[in-house]
């Protein structure tokens, strides 16, 4: 999203690319019955399929509940749907909230734990697994770990994601670019010293894109890091194993949420996994 200042500008940049892609692959817009977009950050809602309406579009355009590229999903779906006279939807946006009351507690009432995670991917892989084993999704206890640019690990209890780390705001394992959980007093000191920027937006951008593996190794490219690990680079090896260590800890924590009654642990990985890490 570099180089554009608003969601409308970003949508205007991406929309012709999407339409050209569909045309290139022989898909006529008139052949679609509906348009579905990924995301975005709306107010907390249960999992499901939602029609895009004016209120949702206003929240997405104004980034009322957070700024993320996934806000474009509903915006673009609505614009394309309006052009062809078809309905627009979003499915399992990343803010679906099925967490228990106790899971929302953080340590202070002013800072409740929020449910922000890779909901669409987690729900999809969990339901696919349920279909593969011939059981209803709502009859299983599953732990699903999405590992990509962000990492979220969810406890799926009988069809509801009752606890999950917030992959957007610094909760859980560090990732390719994000820091995960950090010591709050050290972060406060860095903020007051303006170590990573003079204002909120500069510091937010730092914590969203300059931490994790980037901070430890100088790159977010898993292929490069994997090659360095294979060549015996001690810095890359320690950082990579550290990320795996933290993800494994998060999986273990979610098993406690499910009372140790776990039918399966599902790993959805979009990052390169080197042989030594396995």
Language-model regions: role of each:
Residues 1-9:
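Short glycine-rich, Thr/Ser-proximal phosphate-binding strand/loop in the N-terminal lobe
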Residues 20-33, 132-135, 251-263:
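Phosphate/pyrophosphate-binding loops at sites that engage ATP/ADP/AMP, CoA/4′-phosphopantetheine
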Residues 22-69, 95-106:
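Short beta-strand-loop/turn "lid" adjacent to the catalytic site in phosphate-handling enzymes
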Residues 30-40, 89, 259-270:
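Short glycine-rich phosphate-binding loop at a beta-alpha junction
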Residues 103-193:
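Glycine-rich phosphate-binding loop of actin/hexokinase-like ATP-binding domains
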Residues 125-128, 241-261:
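Phosphate/ATP-binding catalytic cores across multiple sugar-kinase/actin-like superfamilies
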Residues 193-241:
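A mobile "lid/hinge" subdomain adjacent to the ATP/sugar-phosphate binding pocket shared
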Residues 269-277:
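Residue-level detector of conserved catalytic or cofactor/ligand-binding positions
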């Amino acid at each position: 999203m570099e180089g554009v200042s608003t969601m409308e500008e970003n949508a205007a940049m991406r929309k012709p690319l999407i339409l050209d892609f569909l045309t290139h692959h022989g898909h006529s817009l008139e052949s679609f019955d509906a348009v579905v977009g990924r995301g975005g950050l709306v107010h907390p809602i249960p999992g499901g399929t939602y029609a895009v309406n004016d209120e949702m579009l206003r929240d997405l355009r104004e980034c009322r509940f957070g700024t993320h590229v996934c806000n474009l999903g509903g915006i673009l779906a609505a614009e394309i749907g309006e052009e062809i006279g078809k309905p627009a939807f979003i499915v399992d946006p990343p803010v679906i909230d099925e967490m228990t009351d106790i899971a929302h507690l953080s340590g202070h009432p002013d800072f409740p734990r929020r449910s922000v995670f890779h909901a669409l991917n987690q729900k999809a892989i969990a339901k696919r697994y349920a279909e593969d084993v011939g059981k209803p999704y709502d009859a299983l206890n599953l732990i699903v770990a999405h590992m990509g640019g962000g990492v979220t690990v969810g406890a799926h209890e009988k069809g509801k994601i009752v606890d999950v780390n917030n992959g957007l705001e610094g909760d859980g394992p560090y990732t390719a670019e994000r820091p995960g959980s950090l010591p709050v007093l050290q972060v406060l000191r860095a903020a007051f010293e303006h170590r990573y920027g003079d204002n909120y937006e500069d510091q937010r951008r730092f914590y969203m894109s300059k931490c994790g593996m980037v901070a430890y190794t100088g790159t977010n490219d898993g292929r490069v890091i994997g090659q360095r690990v294979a060549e015996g680079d001690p810095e890359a090896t320690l950082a990579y194993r550290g990320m795996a260590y933290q993800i494994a800890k998060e999986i273990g924590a979610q098993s406690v949420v499910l009372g140790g009654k776990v039918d399966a642990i599902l790993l959805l990985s979009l990052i390169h996994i080197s042989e030594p890490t396995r």
